[in-house]
Amino acid sequence: MAKFRRRTCIILSLFIVFIFSLMMGLKMLWPNAASFGPPFGLDLLPELRPPNTHLENKADFQRSDRIDMETNTKDLKGAGVTVHPPRASEVNLEELPPLNYFVHAFYYSWYGNPQFDGKYVHWNHPVLEHWDPRIAKNYPQGRHSPPDDIGSSFYPELGSYSSRDPSVIETHMKQMRSASIGVLALSWYPPDASDENGEATDYLVPTILDKAHKYNLKVTFHIEPYSNRDDQNMHQNVKYIIDKYGNHPAFYRYKTRMGHSLPMFYIYDSYITKPKTWANLLTPSGSQSVRGSPYDGLFIALLVEEKHKYDILQSGFDGIYTYFATNGFTYGSSHQNWNKLKSFCEKNNMIFIPSVGPGYIDTSIRPWNTQNTRNRINGKYYEVGLSAALQTQPSLISITSFNEWHEGTQIEKAVPKRTANTVYLDYRPHKPSLYLEITRKWSEKYSKERMTYALDQQLPAS
């Protein structure tokens, strides 16, 4: 038995010496400059590490904002990194593409998280019930539970961010600048007012204006349907906006063919208010008229149904926009009707602003609304819409949206994410910046084409 143990030990020792010698020999044969790098070639996956994005080590974001970058490699399942907004740094505008001030993007500042707001805001959006109880009973109820469960079918590269975070605002401005978007149309409620799922956001406007100005962007206002909106309080709110923000260099003014430089206001759900009430504000003889006053502007109505165009004309609006990103959902959002709407606007001296979106999916908050989902088809849906818009030779184009995550219309960067209960949609096989890049391409194309037919080539006034 002792001889057997001794023999075993000798054999084992010789085997270890052999393995050690083999490894040393291989090491000597391997080139000194060789490097294995990240396992599985992760350096070849652009989705995992967007270019020019700096990751800070300090725990600025909640642990919950960790984004799981899923790959189809089993060993990497569940791998995650915490993504922070890039640090504010000196901006070299020469390295960024030229702006197109005739391209506007709808922007939302209603998001919040515990770090900046003490709680999640909008990311925890409730699941909305269908109006028919017989249908509603077939779908889940309750609220989303961030950070892993948010009210969106996509997941932001910045995580469940706060719109109050200055670094987030700066990142958004840089993304829009990279897409050649010249103007952001800021969703706006009066001070101390908000949508039913949000908080007041007017106090953010100064920061948004400052950050926009840093990148030479302009800011216009997308006035939401706040409670009891009418001619009187609209007059007060227009006055408030112009008095408080009108002197900021980032405040947007549109130079008309007549040479007037006027603020622009998009009016969401304008059809809710009767034409007679709008006429009080928007016609020269109206009791609350802004016409010819320091608070005059270009007021753009939302057209949903075809009949709305006559109400819009009677109301005294200066133009129409179509907002919705779902082709075929409404008369206004249907591409096939845009040439007719453009002709109507031209005949009545109004501005036509078609709205184009990259897709639509709101089933995270309206699970019963699958019929209005529009697949992105790797950017093809977006490009078809942009092409249709350019064919009308519009004065302006609006993008729905930069960051309306609930309805899946965002062009902001999104990343892959998978949880135990949810697999979020993403932009693969392309990079998170896909829709910014598409926007830039078409913005540049639009800028060149517009020079051949438009009479108002001036830049917006500062």
UniProtKB/Swiss-Prot annotation:
Record carries keyword Transmembrane: yes
Topology term for the membrane: Single-pass type II membrane protein
Swiss-Prot/TrEMBL keywords: Golgi apparatus, Hydrolase, Membrane, Signal-anchor, Transmembrane, Transmembrane helix
Spans annotated as Catalytic: 60-462
Tissue expression pattern: Highly expressed in the liver and kidney.
Domain of life from the UniProt record: Eukaryota
Coiled-coil stretches: none
Gene Ontology CC terms: Golgi membrane
Protein name: Glycoprotein endo-alpha-1,2-mannosidase
Organism: Rattus norvegicus (Rat)
